[in-house]
Amino acid sequence: MDKVTGYVTGVNGNLVAATFSGSVRKNEVGYVQVGDDRLKGEVIRVNGDTASMQIYEMTNGIQVGDRVELSGELMSVELGPGLLTQVFDGLQNPLPELAQQCGFFLQRGVYLDPIPNKDWEFTPLVKPGDHVTAGDAVGSVPEGLFTHLIMVPFGLKDEGWRVKSVREKGVYNVRDTVAVLENDNGEEKELTMVFSWPVKQPIRCYEERLRPDETLAVSYTHLRAHETEADLV
């Protein structure tokens, strides 16, 4: 599928207006080409064939006519083992890896995989033939004191999905297939330990929403300035 492209028609700070010849979605990720740099942004408004994008990098050098390419994907985060041991910037770039590649002065237009390409111990929680829906756990992976549940993607529609196959307990790469699902139509979906989720799309596959029932008590320092008539002279 060809990606939708367009060109810059206006720049105001970190906001860029662009005209496109194809379909554009709100919250879609796009890139402005400035020389050798591809600057990441998000569509925040669509009006006909014109879209307003918020660019999450320095916009120095962007000019009217610069090429813009849409990714076809919504602004998302990656979820999975390795997430808790990382330090990220606002685009989920791992800062230690960025520093190794760019030094102390980070360069714009550099984007790295959020989840490290490591091996983890996977324990299956389902067996072939089990019926599953969005949010069900198919396995678990320990990361320090925390246990990750490897879940059926939250956005998977309920179409009679069942487990076709699942890996035995063992050590696998985070992006290896650990389970395969199949629905009533014969469609298959491979699951790894990692999946992406749009940051502005609510998660609705929950059984119960827990609401707070206790007041959060915090301590603070109260500094009071005493003023006297002598202080004002």
Where in this protein do the model-derived segments appear?
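Acidic-enriched and Gly/Ser
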Residues: 19-134, 139-215
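Low-complexity, intrinsically disordered short peptide segments enriched in small/polar/basic residues
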Residues: 31, 229-230
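Conserved small/polar residues in nucleotide/adenosyl-binding loops
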Residues: 221-228
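Extreme N-terminal "head/tail" segments of very large remodeling/mechanoenzyme assemblies
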Residues: 3-12
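Acidic, proline/serine/threonine- and glycine-rich low-complexity intrinsically disordered segments
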Residues: 217-219
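Short aromatic-glycine-enriched beta-strand elements
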Residues: 16
